[in-house]
Amino acid sequence: MSKSENLYSAARELIPSGVNSPVRAFTGVGGTPLFIEKADGAYLYDVDGKAYIDYVGSWGPMVLGHNHPAIRNAVIEAAERGLSFGAPTEMEVKMAQLVTELVPTMDMVRMVNSGTEATMSAIRLARGFTGRDKIIKFEGCYHGHADCLLVKAGSGALTLGQPNSPGVPADFAKHTLTCTYNDLASVRAAFEQYPQEIACIIVEPVAGNMNCVPPLPEFLPGLRALCDEFGALLIIDEVMTGFRVALAGAQDYYGVVPDLTCLGKIIGGGMPVGAFGGRRDVMDALAPTGPVYQAGTLSGNPIAMAAGFACLNEVAQPGVHETLHELTTRLAEGLLEAAEEAGIPLVVNHVGGMFGIFFTDAESVTCYQDVMACDVERFKRFFHMMLDEGVYLAPSAFEAGFMSVAHSMEDINNTIDAARRVFAKL
């Protein structure tokens, strides 16, 4: 047995399914998950000594690559001063100044410890501010594992929420309306059915949890208009897209102004950080100034703030996002060319430093139904064959891939060459 296999066997005796987050178990592709010993730049190294070109990037945070010296040094320096104080620090102020400077729609920001905390808190704030209970989310979009968000859609354009996980009471889910991503008609139908009850829309501006599905041109502006028409708040969940699709996020890339923004992943530079913020009048409703309660023992802790501050300063440097776009575009185009040569039907969506690979005969993939129609079994084989080639993709047909500026054009070309060999056997 390999070291990964031995560790996985031991882990399953102690940790549910052997992992601390479900997708890591390789359930979506089968086989034994890799146990990682270290990472540097664009590469992961497993406990068996194998190296992989990494397109998971810790599920998004590693936009600068692994083990970036500026972030590593910032963490070391902060740790020497103490790990957590439970009191305000100068770095929290500097971090808030930087975030609100980089994302101009955020007049104020509050730090939390994860993307789930950010979305959960933003929704509570929207409900408290508007005095309304219902929310709209989209089929196939993921906003963390808060009870009200673990909801799936049934048939039809408008579906009253049904729990997607045991342990979520139906009474919690009934206030969550699920609409179809990239379908404004389904959203209008929800508002017309509940014109005075919907507090907010929460949306991934690029859906990254049904692989990578960008918005149609009219979708995000249409959501803004509907929120304005019916008095609801628009929450853009930039946990995945923030500082990756563009410096000011997908909201800037697509030209839409939210009321609240949720951030995570890159904002922590690899440490557990989330944030939510937006309009000053809305944020003023948070405790202790306002009545909407939110708190966290480790929120804004000095280690995480130091890592995030160092990361964002690097991400804000000229040329970072142009490089991300260039590398991602080259990978997408190369994969499509290699698939066409082998007669493999393929769609590759990409925007900024995100991409998604779909095995499908369709000309495009724009919604959850399109994603579900793709050939998942072929993806599973593709994943394992690419792994054998030393390329680590997301171990699920429903997760986006992530580029970093640490990837070289040689890495990209080697990945395309590996895919060409795999497609020939697929």
Swiss-Prot record:
It catalyses: (S)-4-amino-5-oxopentanoate = 5-aminolevulinate. SUPFAM superfamilies: PLP-dependent transferases. PROSITE patterns: AA_TRANSFER_CLASS_3 (PS00600). Coiled coil: none annotated. Its main location: cytoplasm. GO terms for cellular component: cytoplasm. Its EC number is 5.4.3.8. Homodimer. This is Glutamate-1-semialdehyde 2,1-aminomutase. It comes from Shigella dysenteriae serotype 1 (strain Sd197).
